[in-house]
A protein has these predicted regions:
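Loop-helix junctions at membrane interfaces
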Residues: 1-198
Length: 198
């Protein structure tokens, strides 16, 4: 790879990271980050990190995930939600979001090597990124704040583990579906544009 190509690649990564970080902030700070789906609110706030990780790798995805986490932390500090004190802990609000990038990239690359099918690989990466976000956040809540979380949502602390599993299932499945549909569409479109320019 020539010096010019390396410079072009670094510039592209910076642009992609900047644009998707901006989208992540908008989704995090506005109602656009939640899609009403019947009685559920399906989050789309993790999608920029997933798309960045597929297009540009784990570092870019991790940086965008960090931005997502920082927005979540800011909202916890400035908001009056009953769950705000829980999300003030970076282990809950930030770490799982940073891990979206590596989880997505390595799942995507692994499937790409195995199947050679772009859409399937992107979809698998999107599922991995979504699951690490949901399982990471809810897992840390259970490990660190089970009783406090139970009191905040009004359930018996003895059964809060089952409640969290139920939330992971009822929210995680539609979030995975939405993530796959949007990520496949966006990533294939961006790659198609890139190939035409070459």
């Amino acid at each position: 790879m020539t010096t010019l190509q390396k410079t072009h690649e670094k510039t592209r990564r910076l642009v992609v990271a900047g644009m998707l970080s901006a989208v992540s902030i908008v989704l995090g700070m506005t109602p656009l980050g939640i899609i009403p789906l019947g009685p559920l609110g399906v989050t789309t706030m993790h999608l920029p990190a997933i798309i960045g990780a597929i297009l540009e790798g784990p570092v870019v995805g991790g940086v965008i995930g960090l931005i997502f986490g920082l927005v979540s932390l800011y909202k916890a500090v400035s908001g009056g939600s009953l769950l705000a004190p829980i999300f003030m802990n970076p282990l809950v609000s930030i770490l799982p979001r940073i891990l979206i990038g590596p989880a997505t990239t390595y799942a995507y690359r692994g499937l790409e090597k195995l199947t050679k099918k772009h859409a399937l690989s992107i979809g698998g990466g999107a599922v991995a990124g979504t699951l690490i976000n949901t399982a990471g956040v809810m897992g840390f809540i259970y490990m660190l704040y089970a009783r406090q979380y139970a009191e905040a949502i009004g359930v018996d602390p003895a059964t809060v583990g089952y409640t969290i599993l139920g939330i992971c299932a009822t929210n995680g499945i539609p979030e995975c579906i939405v993530a796959v549909v949007i990520s496949v569409a966006v990533c294939l479109a961006v790659r198609g544009i890139g190939r035409r320019r070459k």
